[in-house]
A protein has these predicted regions:
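Conserved N-terminal phosphate-binding loop of PLP-dependent enzymes in the Aspartate aminotransferase
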Residues: 1-351
């Protein structure tokens, strides 16, 4: 009676649901879960590895520490596993927060801080406050992200937004044939022209470009590796940061730990294939990771007092949830120990 109860009909039985099956608590009906809690479920319900660690999960849930300032051995153990299993060696700066939208928010704040400080070092003031983004993008429902998200208008209309440059999203059409390739290359050229126009109009005001490796809510839109290579080249040429929003595409759902790890010369199916890996400067993560946040690379360190080195420049009360971190640690260990990425690839090829 106190909430907008417009969700699905089944009542989730937390104890009896199992594997990929949701059990309705009212009558025991089982439903094959094709929803996976908005892609946040990773190893199903009541996985044996989770159940083996019920006591640990219960213990860390009894009190919620403020991890920005108070550290625990469980936090350190989680970071060890995260580093070992999922953090790329080119993204070693880490920040945790609760919520995927807030993860993106802080990616943007890092970029604004980086660009504005660079401008100030050159004597340029009041510049570095815009984000390039794409049509049909979904990056969240919070402050800055409202200016990026443009899928269902009900999620953004009537809320104040920034007028940041919105770029054509040159996604592939399937099946991929000669005409589809001609069409997508034309759309890529248009997108690059729009990016260059925004840069030419105000060359010092673009802090970053953000893109989902695969647009999820926008329509399951896939892009060519060649396009990501163009974005990387433009980011280096025009001195803005390249952000991949991996909230929905991370932690194995594509057969790689992160979707952008498919963008390699050996895996690229473009003609010709890309020559270099278009690695991001920042990625945002959430959903399957349980705890949300960002990873950032070496370009951030081009600014001495960047947001990762200045105390409280980016921060939150809790710095993520310790319970979520411990659960994510167990998930990562399960993905690693059961070789689930290989299983995802094999299943994907079969389908």
């Amino acid at each position: 009676r106190n909430i907008l109860a417009d969700g699905f009909d089944p009542i989730l039985d937390l104890e009896k649901s199992h594997d990929s099956w949701i059990v309705d608590k009212r009558d025991g009906t089982e439903f094959l879960d094709m929803f996976s809690m908005y892609a946040s479920g990773c190893i199903g319900y009541n996985h044996p590895k989770i159940l083996e660690n019920k006591d640990l999960l219960a213990n860390v849930s009894l009190f919620k520490p403020t991890l920005s300032d108070i550290y625990t051995t469980e936090y350190a153990d989680f970071l060890d596993v995260f580093n070992d299993v999922a953090i790329p060696d080119y993204l070693k700066n880490t920040f945790f927060i609760e919520g995927g939208g807030l993860a993106v928010e802080n990616a943007l704040k890092v970029a604004f801080d980086w660009k504005v400080r660079k401008n100030l070092s050159k004597g340029i003031e009041n510049k570095g406050y815009k984000i390039l983004h794409f049509k049909e993008a979904f990056h969240g429902r919070t402050g800055y992200t409202l200016s990026l998200t443009n899928t269902d208008p009900i999620k953004t209309k009537y809320f104040p937004k920034f007028d940041w440059p919105r770029i054509e999203n040159p996604y592939l059409s399937f099946p991929i044939n000669d005409q589809a390739l001609i069409d997508v290359k034309q759309k890529e050229e248009l997108a690059v022209e729009q990016i260059k126009e925004a840069l030419n109009n105000d060359p010092n005001d673009i802090a970053a470009l953000i893109i989902e490796p695969i647009q999820g809510e926008g329509g399951d839109n896939h892009f060519r590796c060649q396009f990501f290579q163009k974005l990387k080249d433009l980011s280096l040429e025009h001195d803005f940061l390249l952000i991949y929003d991996e909230v929905q595409t991370g932690i194995g759902i594509t057969g790689k730990m992160w979707a952008h790890q498919h963008f390699t010369p050996s895996l690229c199916q473009c003609d010709p294939p890309i020559k270099n890996i278009p690695i991001p400067d920042i990625i945002s993560f959430g959903k399957k990771t349980q705890v949300c946040g960002i990873l950032a690379g070496d370009r951030i360190n081009e600014v001495e007092n960047n947001a990762f080195k200045t105390s409280s420049r980016i921060n939150s009360t809790f710095g993520g949830s310790l319970t979520d971190m411990v659960r994510f640690k167990i998930i990562l260990e399960t993905v690693r120990d059961l070789n689930l990425l290989e299983h995802v690839n094999n299943t994907g090829n079969y389908l």
